[in-house]
Amino acid sequence: MGYVKWSYETLNHFCGDVFKAFGFTEEESNQIKDVLLTADLYGIESHGMQRMVRYHKGIEKGTIHPQAKPEVVFETPISAVIDGHNGMGQLISVYAMKKAIEKAKKTGVGIVTVRESNHFGIAGYYAKMTCAEGLLGMACTNSEAIMVPTFGKKAMLGSNPIAVAMPADPYPFFFDCSTTVVTRGKLEMYNKMEKPLPDGWALDKDGHASTDAPDVLANIVAKKGGGIMPLGGNEEVTGSHKGYGYGMLCELFSSILSMGVTSDHCCTFPDKTGICHGFMAIDPAAFGDPQAIRRHFSEYLEALRESPKAEGKERIYTHGEKEVLAEKERRKHGLPVNDNTMVELANLCGYLKLDFDKYFDGYELPKDSKFFTGNY
């Protein structure tokens, strides 16, 4: 299966109509699609448009409640706990990070945890929200258990991504990564591309290395065992315990401080996922002149980029640089969408009674795709 490119405007229009068909208001739809398409613009297709089918399934199953509103259930001048009431993760998370930013502007720091939410997209979107306010930001989330702890054979932690962003010149520092070798979304992309997984990514239900994406994904959903390795693989000598430990840090800032559902129990309930998040905003002014701190940081980032390159390497990137370049390229030349994802979007249009050809006129669906349900 290959890819087809679409303009940002085409995908933006389509996503907005899909989320309104899901039952969200136009304002809510605009916010959700902005999170998803930002991921696609950054080159993180695993957390972009392809997630819409999963959200539709959540709404149909009753684990995502489109009408739910987040509620502050505990609060201090520097902190808050929010109950998302099983609403849409993107909407809850924007609300939570805005709360953290508000507190940071008043006190120097704002820390907000969330329980009873859903998948929120890329963590970096929320961390980067702080940069527009001149603040340092952090965001993290737990998820359905996919990470097998070091020396284990059963998934007990989520992908548990952690993102950090801070203003700098000429563009912000922006670091966002899962604490697993890869995310579940990456396995889903390999499944759609019908390619075997690279060695060192996943384990089967018996704890043995596996390159079979459909089997690993099925075992994760059915809780049969196996899953994705922590950053560093599955041995201490390669640093497995470090990825496992970073995953636990994320769990602390999301499910533990919020008194929410830990990853090993997420997505085991009939009417909720139980996913939890953590957000932090810090005002550099709490440490001195914020402009001087920004210059100091920017100079260091420039020194990193200009440091000696390894043989055969032309460039050293700082975190966030590739995303800036990807967004510029994709806004100009279009966003690639996998053919099997296009099939899923056509299926979705069939369910929602939307005219697929209205948005993607001239595209010929690969009817031999294993993802085609015939609902189009």
Kindly label every feature range from the protein language model.
Residues 1-8, 13-32, 37-38, 45-66, ...:
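Acidic, glycine/proline-rich low-complexity segments that act as flexible tails and inter-domain linkers
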Residues 2-14, 252, 257, 262-376:
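Catalytic-core signal marking the mid-to-C-terminal active-site face
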Residues 47-101:
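Active-site cofactor/substrate anionic-group-binding motifs, chiefly glycine-
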Residues 73-83, 94-110, 210-232:
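Residues forming anionic-ligand binding surfaces in small-molecule and nucleic-acid pockets
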Residues 79-169, 177-178:
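A generic, well-ordered mixed alpha/beta core segment in the N-terminal half of proteins
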Residues 147-221:
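Phosphate/diphosphate-binding glycine-rich loops and adjacent basic-rich segments that engage nucleotide
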Residues 196-266:
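Secondary-shell segments that build the walls of catalytic and ion/ligand-binding clefts
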